[in-house]
Amino acid sequence: NTCQPTQIAAIALDGRNLKLKGTFNSEIRAEVDDEKAIAAGLGPIEEGALKVTGKTREQIAKAPQLKTVWKKFTAFVDKYNWKGTPFFAPIPAGFNIIGYDMKIINRLCKEFGPWDAKRGEQQLFSKVYKIDVMDNVWMWTEGDPSIKSISMDSLRERMGMSSENAHDALQDVKDTANIMIKFMKTHRAVYRNLKIDKVFANGELYV
């Protein structure tokens, strides 16, 4: 993924009670000259993206450098690595995080660290688990023919969330977190009454 991030935002949630534990947010300087960006192997900043975020090239050019912001961001994430090892690192969660954000994170970890050279992957977040809220929502709604879209904008409208600042990175993170928490609380409530022990012991399988 060659996308140039112009903002990094994240919140940390307690894995047990799902309460807010910390917040990170910073603008990032990106290469605003399209020719220079392409020459560096990066995607140029699209005018459509600027319209969505409300940012200008001038503002982006004055933001803190990516390397500086990344160092602060990784320090923020590491605060919540309770054993200080890659396998106990925070679980990354987001909307389409597997198909989009994690690709950028892998790229930036390879460039600035932390990077696992042996495995060829990032070493900032959990190596085992990832929570993609988009996939989660799809699992809940796939059997409902009335659902035409599960985009963030559609979910905001359906769930009665404000669309103000909807494409600011921090607001996106908060909105995604609220949706995730709602579904996780539902998961937990359903699981308490779910009977799965020896459910296939009678040999009645689906396939």
Regions of interest found by a model, annotated:
Residues Y100-Y129:
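Substrate-recognition/cap helix-loop segment adjacent to the acidic, metal-dependent catalytic center
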Residues N1-N106, S154-M161, H167:
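Conserved non-catalytic scaffold segment of RNase H-like nuclease domains
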Residues R158, L170, K174-V207:
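Acidic two-metal-ion nuclease catalytic site recognized across multiple nuclease folds
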Residues R57-A61, D116-K127, S163-A169:
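Short, surface-exposed acidic
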Residues K127-S146:
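Short alpha-helix plus adjacent loop in nuclease-associated cores
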Residues T141-P145, E164-Q171:
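Active-site metal-coordination segments of metallo-dependent hydrolases
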Residues D144-R158:
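A structural motif
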Residues D78-F87, G113-R119, Y191:
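Alpha-helix termini
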